[in-house]
Curated annotation (Swiss-Prot):
Residues 43-96 are annotated as: Disordered. GO terms for biological process: translation. Residues 58-69 have a biased composition (Basic residues). Pfam families: Ribosomal_L4. Part of the 50S ribosomal subunit. One of the primary rRNA binding proteins, this protein initially binds near the 5'-end of the 23S rRNA. It is important during the early stages of 50S assembly. It makes multiple contacts with different domains of the 23S rRNA in the assembled 50S subunit and ribosome. Belongs to the universal ribosomal protein uL4 family. This is Large ribosomal subunit protein uL4.
Length: 205
């Protein structure tokens, strides 16, 4: 698969990327499963509701059992009552995780990268570095490359690059092992350094 190789001025040449990573067919069902599982595994239980034993209430019987003409009632904490406990309350201990084995996950990443390559959303650079940790420098460099919303995958995250880009809402810098499926499809473009492609091939090939 041929990808764009950009220089510092944004001029493009051709880079021959391995087909084992960037030349696979797109498997929509697999990618959907991998992305949904990734989102589910990142989810933490933050919903809490009270059952009838946890709501604040009195144990006094609201009225006598017989003779009033009303339906019998034992406690105001009953789920049938307004202000009563939930029958099946949500709990912070809920487990939302979904299992995706390594083979499927890697195949999903390969499928995403291949589709991004076909859509011309991947570009390659020799290296990506900055002289100092200045956001202004990072913005100028990305502008010269014609990029705004971009995921930068580099073999080793340079401290200057990390500090300069961490305040940019549409830019993220990661190493190949941290390139997750959600980030790959979230950003408009993916910028990969040559050494990072070698690492991806070693990880996913």
């Amino acid at each position: 698969m041929d990808l764009k190789l950009l220089n510092d001025q944004g001029q493009a040449a051709t880079f021959s990327a391995p087909d084992t990573i960037f030349g696979r067919d797109f498997n929509e069902a697999l990618v959907h499963q991998v992305v949904v599982a990734y989102q589910a595994n990142a989810r933490s239980g933050n919903r809490a509701q009270k059952d009838r034993a946890e709501v604040k209430h009195t144990t006094k019987k609201p009225w006598r059992q017989k003779g009033t003409g009303r339906a019998r009632a034992g406690m105001t904490s009953s789920p049938l009552w307004r202000g009563g406990g939930r029958t099946f309350p949500n709990s912070p201990e809920e487990n939302f995780s979904q299992k995706v084995n390594k083979k499927m996950y890697r195949a999903g990443i390969r499928s995403i990268l291949s589709q991004l390559a076909r859509e011309d959303r991947i570009a390659v650079v020799d290296t990506f570095g900055l002289e100092s940790p200045k956001t202004k420098l990072a913005v100028a460099k990305l502008k010269s490359l014609g990029l705004d919303s971009v995921l930068i995958i580099t073999d080793a995250v340079d401290e200057n690059v990390y500090l300069a880009t961490r305040n940019l809402p549409h830019v993220a810098v990661v190493e190949p092992r941290y390139a997750d499926p959600l980030s790959l499809i979230h950003y408009k473009k993916v910028l990969i350094t040559k050494p990072a492609i070698a690492q991806l091939e070693e990880m996913l090939g």
